[in-house]
Regions:
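Conserved active-site neighborhood of the chymotrypsin/trypsin-like protease fold
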Residues: 1-48, 53-56, 71-74
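Conserved positions in beta-strands of structured domains
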Residues: 9-11, 64, 82, 179
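C-terminal cap/linker of serine protease catalytic domains
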Residues: 10, 97-167
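Active-site region of chymotrypsin-like
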Residues: 24-31, 55-130
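Short, well-structured beta-strand
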Residues: 139-142, 263-339
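Short conserved aromatic/hydrophobic patches within beta-strands of well-structured domains
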Residues: 168-179, 331, 335
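Secretory pathway targeting signatures of secreted, lumenal, and periplasmic proteins
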Residues: 177-242
Length: 339
């Protein structure tokens, strides 16, 4: 293993695309040619890999274009990628590499990194004229550029809204953050009425086995007491409010501890003497190896004397301080429970 490592040298990396460029001193067979154009929709493809450590395996499938619901481009490959095939090439009928195996959603729904990511990485290396000396710094630069582009796109859009109970919440902003929700309105046995809405991005940027970033998630909950007394209802509200977690994972080697700021507000009702009690919690943890990047977790909860409650929440992974502040301001300006 040591001799193998000594004969290879990292020359470039694209963390979002999950591809790297290596230089080897070994004598290698002729490289596989890289496709210069995308295949036609429905073209046969052949994925190569070592599934479950069973040896070199060829898996046939079909090209179904670039997934339009992913922020980072991914080829939709209709074929069965399995554990052990990640990083292997997928070839066209003419033997050209059209993508790199990266993930599967099961039921023959799999994804490839487009070969364009390799073309871009090679072009970047040629323009630079030398290898990357500090890979941690380079990855940090790519992560910061990636989040800057993502949030500039988000802030440039109108954020659509929808009703959830008596509250106004944020609907699907962009295709790469899918939304779903539900309610218990059809249940006759429910102790309270509830409705919820969740939107979450499908793009994780892999950094290590226990560390990923790039996730965006926002959630809303509407609650109304029905059969619960006020004490029971408030206890459930408090339990739900404290049950949120970050959208990504990382160890103490990767991330600092969360630092949180809580604010309590009393918002007077316009129409009667009842009051709403509101709580905001804003938590931030820093990335140890990537300065100026943070994970952010935000919670807002409001409960009123008529035993109704509204909770909103978002989590952002790998975001700059400025973009986090802009997001929370925009979020609170759109998601609200009108008087």
């Amino acid at each position: 293993a040591q001799s193998a490592a000594a004969s290879h040298r990292f020359m470039g990396i694209n963390q979002e695309g999950q591809v790297a460029l290596l230089q080897t001193q070994d004598t290698m067979p002729s490289p596989l040619p890289l496709a210069m154009v995308e295949p036609d929709m429905g073209s046969p493809l052949f994925a190569l890999g070592n599934p479950l450590d069973l040896g070199l395996t060829v898996v046939p499938g079909t090209y179904n274009g670039v997934n339009q619901t992913s922020y980072h481009p991914r080829v939709h490959f209709t074929g069965s990628l399995n554990a052990g095939m990640s990083g292997g090439p997928t070839l066209s009928e003419t033997g050209e590499v059209v993508g790199i195996n990266v993930s599967t959603a099961g039921n023959q729904v799999s994804f490839l990194v487009p070969v364009k990511a390799l073309h871009n990485l090679r072009a970047e290396h040629r323009a630079r004229g030398q290898g990357v000396s500090d890979f941690t710094q380079r990855i940090g630069e790519q992560l910061k550029a990636d989040q800057a582009d993502k949030f500039s796109r988000l802030f440039a859009l109108e954020w659509p809204t929808m009703s959830l109970g008596s509250a106004q919440v944020i609907a699907e902003i962009v295709p790469f953050a899918k939304c779903w929700g539900g309610s218990n309105s059809a249940s006759e046995k429910a102790q309270f009425r509830s409705a919820d809405r969740t939107c979450r991005s499908e793009d994780n940027i892999y950094l290590s086995g226990g560390f990923n970033t790039g996730v965006m998630e926002y959630q809303f909950f509407w609650l109304e007491a029905d059969k619960l007394n006020p004490m029971q209802f408030y206890a459930y509200y408090e339990r739900l409010f404290g049950d949120f977690a970050p959208g990504n994972k990382g160890s103490e080697e990767d991330l600092g501890e969360y630092r949180c700021d809580s604010q309590f507000l009393a918002l007077a009702e316009n129409r009667n003497s009842d009051s709403r009690k509101s709580k905001n919690v804003f938590c931030v943890r820093a990335y140890k190896d990537f300065p100026d990047l943070y994970d952010v977790l935000f919670l807002h909860g409001t409960v009123d004397a008529s035993r109704a409650a509204f909770i909103s929440h978002f989590t952002l992974a790998g975001v700059s301080q400025n973009n986090a502040k802009r997001f929370v301001q925009r979020f609170l300006g759109v998601a609200k429970w009108p008087s």
